Amino acid sequence: MLIVLPPSETKTHGGSGKPLDFHHLSFPSLTKARQTILADLQALEVDEALKVLGISEKLRPEAESNRALETSPTMPAIFRYSGVLYDALDAATLPEKALERLAIGSALFGVIHATDPIPHYRLSGGTKLPTKSGELPTMKARWGTSISEALIDVNQLVIDLRSGTYQQLGRVKDAVTVRVESVMEDGSRKVVSHFNKHYKGELARVLALSEKEAHNAEDVMSIAQAAGLVVEENPNHKETLTLVV
């Protein structure tokens, strides 16, 4: 199984790895698109980047880091991204076998494996990044069907924990997806938004550490339930599971 996580806007700076080498990234079919997007992102002057990326002057260092994408140090992607989901995942305590089951969606790289070395960058899935010819394509248009095709080619069950924006960049037919819901006092259900990432991080950790391999949604549910999580099937869509918290 391959567990695909969403990226995070917050990232760890620095790193001790050599500068970015596209040949050291997984899913080589995405290389050409990666190179084009990176070149367009790196070409943005900082003031223009603030507007394009939709960030404030306070985050100017984020835009400045994009000017050095090919020269700045790298670190494994799983440690580059930070935030609520990654805190719950606690990748630093995962064995190598568990890390091999993890991938991450990315506006810049499409999808990468957890251990792929990447630099610090700022680019979200909803950004319209200008091309050298002045066009403003969406990230979805830039990636086309390439992310979907790359994930289909892994020939494993894909457990897609990406947020909607990143799923739009490359959906995977028959992938298992997960909704997070809480039970209200009156028994009704409410979709969890604020802590959604935390619970998905916990689920990703459980799945990554599992001694069993998942081949379908029922297997995913079984693994999660064995670890004490409350997971339910969706009678109307067998690939969609509900994590109840």
From Swiss-Prot:
Stretches assigned to coiled coil: none
Superkingdom, natural source: Bacteria
GO process annotations (BP): response to hydroperoxide
GO cellular component: cytosol
Pfam families according to UniProt: H2O2_YaaD
Alphabetized InterPro entries for the sequence: YaaA
PANTHER family, per database record: PEROXIDE STRESS RESISTANCE PROTEIN YAAA (PTHR30283:SF4), PEROXIDE STRESS RESPONSE PROTEIN YAAA (PTHR30283)
Protein family: Belongs to the UPF0246 family.
HAMAP family in alphabetical order: UPF0246 (MF_00652)
Protein name listed in UniProt: UPF0246 protein Cgl1995/cg2186
